[in-house]
UniProtKB/Swiss-Prot annotation:
The keyword Protease applies. The lineage of its organism: Bacteria, Pseudomonadati, Pseudomonadota, Gammaproteobacteria, Enterobacterales. Binds 2 manganese ions per subunit. The gene is pepB. Mn(2+) 1 binds at residues 200, 277, 279. It is found in: Cytoplasm. Keywords: Aminopeptidase, Cytoplasm, Hydrolase, Manganese, Metal-binding, Protease. PANTHER family: LEUCINE AMINOPEPTIDASE-RELATED (PTHR11963), PEPTIDASE B (PTHR11963:SF20). PROSITE patterns: CYTOSOL_AP. Belongs to the peptidase M17 family. GO terms for cellular component: cytoplasm. The keyword Magnesium does not apply. This is Peptidase B. Its EC number is 3.4.11.23.
Length: 427
C-alpha cells in the first residue's frame, strides 16, 4: 500500500485558479476539501467519489473539522465494489468513533450483501447472514426460526412458497426475535418485514435483460431492515423487536407459478396472479400476516417493490407510504436527523380497491385503468396488515441500488435507510 494521501477540510474557497466551482484543490501536502456551509456532507461525499476516480486508494483524513458524520460522508462516496481502499481515520472522541465503527460494520454489511452475486447469495444464505449479523451485536438476546421449502406450504405460507417453488433453491422464512427484556411474555414493540428476493427474473412475466441485470439486488429490503435492527441494537435498543425476512428466487421452471394461479393466504384472502413479476408483494403478504399477529405498536416493511417508485423518485429517495400521518411524520423526522432521503407518496383508501380480479378477491397487479403502480402495490399490502390505518409504514426502496456510478455514489448498493429506521426504533 502506498503512502496515504492527506485529506483536509477548509472553510475557505479554493484558489481562484481552480475555478469558482472547485470543491477541492491539490497541493504538496495533499488534497483540501473546501466547505461552503450549505451542503458540506454532500460536498465531502462527492469529493470522495472524485478522489477515488483519481485512483487514490489510501487516504488519511487529517486536520480539524472531521467528525463521525463527515467521516461517514467521505466513506459513502469513497467505497466501491471493486478494489481495496484504506482510510486512516482522524482522532474522534469515544462516542463518535463507536458510532462510526458501527456504521462501517453494519451499513457496509448491507451494501456488500446487496452487491453479492445471486450465485453466492440464495434464500438460505441470506437468512443465515442476517442471523449472523444480529447475533454478533445482540448475543443471547436473539432467538430465531428458519422455515423452508415444503414446510412453508404445510404451515400455510402460500405466497412465499408459490413464488419460490420454481427454483432449485428452496424459499425461506426467517423469523427472528430480539428480546432484550429476557421476558418471554414481553410485548413486541415493533415488527420489521423485508422482501428477500435473491434473484428476480420476473418469472413467466419475464423481464428484459436491461431490467433483469440488477436483480441480484431485489433482496435490498431484507438487507435494509436487517441492518436497521442491528444498528438500532448498537444504539441501545431496549424494546422487543421481531424481524421477518421473506426470501426466495423468482425463476422460470416447470414447477414455477403461472398467470391465473390463485393463492389462498392464512388470513383468508385469495389473490389471482396476473403478473409473476409482481412477486414481492406476494411474499411480503406472508410476513405481514405474521407481523400483525404479534400485535406490535409498529410495523415497518421494506422492499424493492415497484419500478413506479423509481419512475417517481429516481434512485435518490426511498418512497414512503402510510395511512398514519403522525407515524409517517416521525419517520420523515428521523430521516432528516440521519441525513437520509425519504419522500412520502400517496396512499389512500381507494388504492386498496384498484386491484380487481374476476376470480379472486384481489389481483396482484393493477390494470391499465389504475396506473399508480407504487400506490396500488402499497394498497395490496394493506390487505395483509390487520390494523393498516395505524402503526404501519411501507418503504418502497427506490434508493437502495444504483446500476451505474453517479457523482456521489459508486455503482451498486447505497445502504440508505438503515439509520433512519434505527433512529425511529430507538426514538
Amino acid at each position: 500500500m502506498t503512502e496515504a494521501m492527506k485529506i483536509t477540510l477548509s472553510p475557505q474557497p479554493a484558489d481562484a485558479r481552480w475555478g469558482e466551482k472547485a470543491t477541492y484543490s491539490i497541493n504538496n501536502d495533499g488534497i483540501t476539501l473546501h466547505l461552503n456551509g450549505a451542503d458540506d456532507l454532500g460536498l465531502i461525499q462527492r469529493a470522495a467519489r472524485k478522489i477515488d476516480g483519481l485512483g487514490i486508494k489510501h487516504v488519511q483524513l487529517s486536520g480539524e473539522g472531521w467528525d463521525a458524520d463527515r467521516c461517514w460522508a467521505f466513506w459513502q462516496g469513497y467505497k466501491a465494489p471493486k478494489g481495496i481502499r484504506k482510510v486512516e481515520w482522524p482522532d474522534l472522541d469515544d462516542a463518535q468513533r463507536q458510532e462510526l465503527d458501527n456504521r462501517l460494520m453494519i451499513i457496509d454489511w448491507v451494501r456488500d450483501t446487496i452487491n453479492a452475486p445471486a450465485e453466492e447469495l440464495g434464500p438460505s444464505q441470506l437468512a443465515q447472514r442476517a442471523v449472523d449479523l444480529i447475533s454478533n451485536v445482540a448475543g443471547d438476546r436473539v432467538t430465531y426460526r428458519i422455515t423452508k421449502g415444503e414446510d412453508l406450504r404445510e404451515q400455510g405460507y402460500m405466497g412465499l412458497h408459490t413464488v419460490g417453488r420454481g427454483s432449485e433453491r428452496s424459499p425461506v422464512l426467517l423469523a427472528l426475535d430480539y428480546n432484550p427484556t429476557g421476558d418471554k411474555e414481553a410485548p413486541v414493540y415493533a415488527c420489521l418485514v423485508g422482501k428477500g428476493i435473491t434473484f428476480d427474473s420476473g418469472g413467466y412475466s419475464i423481464k428484459q435483460t436491461a431490467f433483469m441485470d440488477s436483480m441480484k439486488s431485489d433482496m435490498g429490503g431484507a438487507a435494509t431492515v436487517t441492518g436497521a435492527l442491528a444498528f438500532a441494537i448498537t444504539r441501545g435498543l431496549n424494546k422487543r423487536v421481531k424481524l421477518f425476512l421473506c426470501c426466495a428466487d423468482n425463476l422460470i421452471s416447470g414447477n414455477a407459478f403461472k398467470l391465473g394461479d390463485i393463492i389462498t393466504y392464512r388470513n383468508g384472502k385469495k389473490v389471482e396472479v396476473m403478473n409473476t413479476d409482481a412477486e414481492g408483494r406476494l411474499v411480503l403478504a406472508d410476513g405481514l400476516i405474521d407481523a400483525s399477529a404479534q400485535k406490535p405498536e409498529l410495523i415497518i416493511d421494506a422492499a424493492t417493490l415497484t419500478g413506479a417508485a423509481k419512475t417517481a423518485l429516481g434512485n435518490d429517495y426511498h418512497a414512503l407510504f402510510s395511512f398514519d400521518d403522525a407515524l409517517a411524520g416521525r419517520l420523515l423526522a428521523s430521516a432528516a436527523q440521519e441525513n437520509e432521503p425519504f419522500w412520502r407518496l400517496p396512499l389512500a383508501e381507494f388504492h386498496r380497491n384498484q386491484l380487481p380480479s374476476n376470480f379472486a378477491e384481489l389481483n396482484n397487479t393493477g390494470s391499465a385503468a389504475y396506473p399508480a403502480g407504487a400506490s396500488t402495490a402499497a394498497g395490496f399490502l394493506s390487505h395483509f396488515v390487520e390494523n393498516y390505518q395505524q402503526g404501519w409504514l411501507h418503504i418502497d426502496c427506490s434508493a437502495t441500488y444504483r446500476k451505474a456510478p453517479v457523482e456521489q455514489w459508486s455503482a451498486g448498493a447505497t445502504g440508505l435507510g438503515v439509520r433512519t429506521i434505527a433512529n425511529l426504533l430507538t426514538a
